[in-house]
Amino acid sequence: MAKDIEAAAAHEGKDYSDPPPAPLVDAEELTKWSLYRAVIAEFVATLLFLYITVATVIGYKHQTDAAASGPDAACGGVGVLGIAWAFGGMIFILVYCTAGVSGGHINPAVTFGLFLARKVSLVRALLYIVAQCLGAICGVGLVKGFQSAFYVRYGGGANELSAGYSKGTGLAAEIIGTFVLVYTVFSATDPKRNARDSHVPVLAPLPIGFAVFMVHLATIPITGTGINPARSLGAAVIYNNDKAWDDHWIFWVGPFIGAAIAAAYHQYVLRASAAKLGSSASFSR
């Protein structure tokens, strides 16, 4: 009986395993079609994400414009809640669709955090970020092409620091918001959780999308919610207004800092990777 209990305990302790750290530079990866397929998936997913979300923002502003003519003028629009749902819902859908191909990053900050945690190589991270930025630019470009009459009039969906808030407040909002997102990504994709909940594959995209939704509710009044440098860059490039570029650095620095903190917190506090490394070093002496 005791042996059965020990065997069961040993089996439970080995029901999952952490994948080995990704190499910093993997030249062989460049010869694999799977890498380029993943890059294409990131490009298309980010394009769709920006198209739907920015179109929602423009549509809402048009519907609530008192000077607008026609039946839309009397419509209350989707509101901030609807905009937040558009962003969170699209992330849920796109992560679910692309997770098996590229991991479903759709955000340079997420890619950066996973790179710091050695989940992806430097080569893959750089290609992902380039694809995400290009996809975002193309996605916002489609919005401008389809809604040219309203695009410039309603701000192009660009992130801007709202009046009454300091640069420090905007930066802090982006850091905290991105921390929430990337921390959720790490937790939802943790190998131990995957082993236990593998029969419910929707569980990972759901909290990630919901995190995006909640962060938008909190930070739309402050920065319009960036937490995704590609999203901010795409809107700024297509809108190309001085105000959109004035504080654009906030939407890169903030998310990257937030992602780095989330990666460190998950890897070296929650998963105690630092302790594991220390133990390995002591045994090797």
UniProtKB/Swiss-Prot annotation:
GO terms for molecular function: water channel activity. GO terms for cellular component: membrane; plasma membrane; protein-containing complex. Specifically expressed in roots, in the exodermis, endodermis and xylem parenchyma. Polar localization to the external periclinal side of epidermal cells in root apices. SUPFAM superfamilies: Aquaporin-like. The chain crosses the membrane at residues 38-58, 75-95, 126-146, 168-188, 202-222, 250-270. Induction: Expressed in roots with a circadian rhythm showing an increase at the end of the night period, a peak during the first part of the light period and then a decrease. One of its GO terms (biological process) is protein heterotetramerization. Keywords: Cell membrane, Membrane, Repeat, Transmembrane, Transmembrane helix, Transport. It is a multi-pass membrane protein. A motif (NPA 2) lies at residues 228-230. InterPro entries: Aquaporin-like, Aquaporin_transptr, MIP, MIP_CS. Aquaporins contain two tandem repeats each containing three membrane-spanning domains and a pore-forming loop with the signature motif Asn-Pro-Ala (NPA). Belongs to the MIP/aquaporin (TC 1.A.8) family. PIP (TC 1.A.8.11) subfamily. Water channel required to facilitate the transport of water across cell membrane. Its function is impaired by Hg(2+). May play a role in water uptake from the root surface. Active as homomers. Increased activity when heteromerization with PIP1-2. This is Aquaporin PIP2-5. It comes from Zea mays (Maize). The lineage of its organism: Eukaryota, Viridiplantae, Streptophyta, Embryophyta, Tracheophyta.
